[in-house]
Amino acid sequence: MNDIAVAVRGLKKVFPVPFHRQSIVAVRDLDLDVGAGEVYGLLGPNGSGKSTTLKIILGLVSPTRGKTEIFGRNSNLVESREKVGFLPENPYFYKYLTGEETLRFFGKLCGLRGSPLQKRIAELLDLVGLTNAQHRRLGTYSKGMLQRIGLAQALINDPRLVVLDEPTAGVDPAGSHEIRNLIVDLKRRGITVLLSSHLLAQAQEICDRVGILANGVLVREGRLEQLIAIENQTELVLENASPELVRKIETLAQASNAKLIAQRKSTTTLERLFLDATRNDKR
């Protein structure tokens, strides 16, 4: 099995502006890898190139230059996308269908029939917590419920890779938490998740690695614990320690009955890293 789920090499996308001599560079010389089985967050402000990058990976937009691969296959090939699920930022739903009918419709598009399809529908409705709402029309669903049925729709073909473009956009905190738990569950099942998000605290909770885009450029990329670590600072967590002991740190701790619970790198937050990264990039 290929250990790299998604590979992006030298990716550039330029959009011409009609009736103008200018053009918009949406993505600039982008290189990144998404490991199989990990949750990778592509972060950035509006217009940074996140959605364009995802659409190129999915074969929905052609790159100006560069290439993308899904599990070692060129993503332009239809076969490379047979085991890929996608939830766009603003998915379109047939509001007159019920939740069950929606999954049945997309399941048939993916070639499922009979009892395997019915079993898959039941599994997914249970996974996203919509079993009790399966016979309701989508027109009666809340935004959070629509996102969950959209995620179930993206999973109908039992994908190895799921691409989520702003999966919690417009969802209230409770619904956002449910989506977060579903993404964690996908990771537990060994499914690779590539997502874009503007909810940095949530991304910090669920992503193994992140890449931060600004003006189409990857300005930060790596594992979260490394990115948010503050160099030359260490936190000591002590039990039963007096304020004096805290000030004197380890030497006095060893001479006392205080117990050193943990020692770790001090960290910033993903939100602070994001703001610093995007503020400093002037391209």
List each model region and its residues:
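Short, charged/small-residue-rich alpha-helical element at the C-terminal edge
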Residues: 224-283
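Generic structural hydrophobic/aromatic packing signal, biased to beta-strands
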Residues: 1, 19-21, 236, 243
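ABC transporter nucleotide-binding domains
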Residues: 3-6, 13-195, 200-214, 219-220
